[in-house]
């Protein structure tokens, strides 16, 4: 959300952001509500059914928040899966269905990103899925490539710039 916020601020939008971090070890999620507009934005929170775009780095999280999307909302999801703590402790069974298939069956326009597809011995893309997904989202939205590259360059610590730019190009 930090990189996107810089893009929107540079382009004259008002924005509000809220990060909600649940207790992951207890099955809680992490979510960022991000609203921008040319008009005044009063609250960062978006009610269920009003979300335009869902970007998710883990499939259970994608399924958890699918209901928040508008009918014509768009999903960007990684293929990465984590078992919940209740599955790990055998209190519950994991879903037998493919989570990717369930996401696709939602009827939403869906982009599934597989970090394994671009893995190489010298570059672990899974560590930078946020930047890969940002690049895919920015391309989908038609944001200027050069401007986004510059914002990524300005947004990450110097020692991580090269890796993040490589991840952006992979996206």
PLM feature spans:
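Active-site cofactor/cluster-binding pocket
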Residues: 1-170
